[in-house]
Regions:
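Arginine residue identity/basic-tract feature
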Residues: 26, 74, 93-96, 104, ...
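Glutamate identity and glutamate-enriched acidic tracts
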Residues: 4, 12, 35, 41, ...
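Long, helix-rich, hydrophobic modules that act as membrane-proximal anchors or helical bundle/coiled-coil regulators
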Residues: 2-5, 29-44, 48, 80, ...
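Interdomain/boundary linker segments immediately adjacent to catalytic/signaling cores
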Residues: 1-85
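Metal-dependent nuclease catalytic core centered on acidic motifs
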Residues: 145-210
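Context-gated lysine
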Residues: 44, 51, 63, 104, ...
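Hydrophobic transmembrane alpha-helix bundles
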Residues: 8, 135-151
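Catalytic centers of nucleases
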Residues: 61-142
Length: 210
């Protein structure tokens, strides 16, 4: 019998593989790649009936919806990436929690409203820009809800807000002015909202390039 710990590790590895593949493949190959990942996970989790099936169903749902996005080219060549990130975020987060026997933590709204997802009941707007400062500047347009940025961007922000003087981003060391601009933008947004940044900023399970 496969141990619970072994299966748990397999699930985490499968999810990590899912994220890695999103980073490296062309849109045209996305369907086949996700199918391969999910088939592999199905084999690994064959001994866990309920939780495994629920976890895999969330990844399978994301795969189907992402394939539909590609087929319809929703949002065009650039906008489709934003929609893909919403479905990927939802599928991965929910797969993780239902495997632990918990309720789904994310609801994808998909209704063209200001909020993209509900994260543990909170309205959240997702922004995946190459430029961290531009993401932060968008936050003022959604002052009634939380913001969700790529995981690697949030890590940079956390380092800056903790007082780090040397911060790397995309393999480059940020200049003093870049660090100060990001810090000031976060402080200004927090002042407008009346709460610290960790109360309105959420980290994605995905990095920007994912």
């Amino acid at each position: 019998m496969i141990s619970e710990q072994t299966i748990d590790n397999n699930v985490e590895q499968g999810i990590a593989s899912y994220v890695d593949y999103l980073n490296n493949i062309r849109l045209a190959d996305l369907m086949n790649t996700l199918e391969s990942i999910l088939s592999n996970e199905t084999d690994k989790l064959s001994d866990l009936a309920s939780k495994s099936a629920n976890a895999l169903s969330n990844l399978d749902w994301a795969k189907i919806e992402i394939n539909n996005l590609i087929d319809s080219n929703r949002g065009g060549d650039t906008g489709v990436h934003g929609f893909i990130s919403e479905f990927a975020e939802t599928g991965i987060r929910n797969a993780r929690v239902v495997y632990q026997g918990l309720q789904k933590s994310v609801v994808l709204l998909n209704d063209n409203g200001p909020a993209d997802i509900l994260l543990q009941g909170k309205e959240v707007q997702m922004k995946f820009y190459a430029n961290i400062l531009e993401e932060i500047k968008q936050a003022s347009n959604y002052d009634k809800m939380s913001m969700l940025f790529p995981r690697d961007h949030v890590e940079v922000i956390e380092k800056i807000m903790s007082g780090a003087k040397t911060v790397e981003f995309n393999g480059n060391v940020l200049s003093g002015s870049q660090i100060n601009n990001i810090r000031k933008a976060i402080e200004d947004e927090s002042a407008l909202r009346g709460v610290s940044y960790d109360k309105w900023l959420e980290s994605s399970v995905l990095k920007y390039k994912d």
